[in-house]
Amino acid sequence: MAELSLQHVDKIYDNNVQAVFDFNLEVKDKEFIVFVGPSGCGKSTTLRMIAGLEEISAGDFYIDGKRMNDVEPKDRDIAMVFQSYALYPHMSVYENMAFGLKLRKYSKEEIDKRVHEAARILEIEPYLDRKPKALSGGQRQRVALGRAIVRNAKVFLMDEPLSNLDAKLRVQMRSEIIQLHERIGATTIYVTHDQTEAMTMADRIVVMKGGYIQQIGTPKEIYNNPANLFVAGFLGGPATNFVKGTYTNGFFQVEDMKIEIPLMYREKLSSYQGKEIIMGIRPEDLHGEGIVADTYPSANFDFEIEVAELLGHEYILHGTLNGQKMCAKVNSRLEPEAHSTIKLTMDLSKIHFFDMETENRID
């Protein structure tokens, strides 16, 4: 398929507003890359520059070693799927899928072959004669995917393709897109603001904020080793807890509570003696007392529950630790109650520390 290279790419609009800053990324052949971040972070703008729908203000973009900055969108061998299905309402499913191929003067036989092959892969062959209005949202999205598949393009670009679907259908379509990628092997860049989509679908994730790349890595790398406060707080649900405290002589102190820091962190924190830092701990790494194995460093503390949300197999607890807001995921067997205090254990092998000024993880 294709390898992509974006080198020092910027996007500056005519009003001098810069949307993307020094974007650098190497995409391997057949890789599934997800751009994730909040609205306005530059992820869709970057995707549109790759597609040729936005001009690159500075830097270079290559496909298989060929510079693409000045190549017309139609000549980039890229297929794109948008948030909107963008189907022609007066055309049948077959006609919608065949439309782009007709414009490119493919033979009737080749068009028929490609449309039926894509329809078979997407399991929409029974609907080829129907109009879009007769289809469900999921079926319409499959038609939009099929229109891209028939192109046999080197690169697939997907701009929030599932955001118009309900929660149950999004889960189903996530799985279908992953399976589709495995079957056709196209190099794919997928844009979303949904961190669940990013974590479950990507080979690698590009986390963006304010036009800058915050971190690039596999879902596991980013989840376990977030580069900064933003990444730690953005990926994972509920979000990572952040607790401000002071590091002194091997202890992290929050008000009148002291947590003894494991030796593996102390060398990293040696230059922060007596300084205020931020500790990050994910809700799933707070457990009922006695749950953490003795082989792992841990700390016990009293947790004042304000709200207890039962999700069947677990509770999401919202409360405070020495006056600072925290959230914990605990097994439903604990049967915690709102406006009560329980003992929780913090798995200290899973904590992170962040610099107060730079907000970067302390390594």
Go through each PLM region and give its residues.
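Short coil-to-beta microelement around the adenine-binding A-loop and adjacent beta1/P-loop entry
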Residues: 16-18
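Helix-to-loop junction immediately C-terminal to a conserved catalytic motif
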Residues: 51
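ABC nucleotide-binding domain "signature motif"
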Residues: 57-67, 213
